[in-house]
Amino acid sequence: KLFRFGGEHNHFIEGEDKEVKVIEVDGIKIALLICFELRFKNLWAQIEGADIVAVPSWWGGLRTEHFKSLTQTLAIMNQCYVIASDSLNDDCSKMSGIVNPKGEVTRNGDRELLEIP
């Protein structure tokens, strides 16, 4: 995690390596952006070429539209799948979902289970 948000400095140490790596598993290139890292386009450039970008988060409910827009834009800009997870905590956006490279979205909203048909 490169950026600490809110009170996270009480529990986490900022990462030392400012470069985001893309790993390959069975021919699939996978990258990880943790929560607030989603907001930095210089990090998007570092993961260009990834097939899948995972975004685990604890995204505040007041910024729900930001989370939705950023994950969708990341998928379109990098032509990749974005798998975004967020907490079901009442203070969070509850917008876990999968965005395809065309920007088409399947999200769980306030449901407890995300099902892909």
Residue spans of the language-model regions?
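CN hydrolase (nitrilase-like) catalytic-core segments centered on the catalytic cysteine
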Residues: 39-113
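Exposed aromatic-hydrophobic patches
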Residues: 115-117
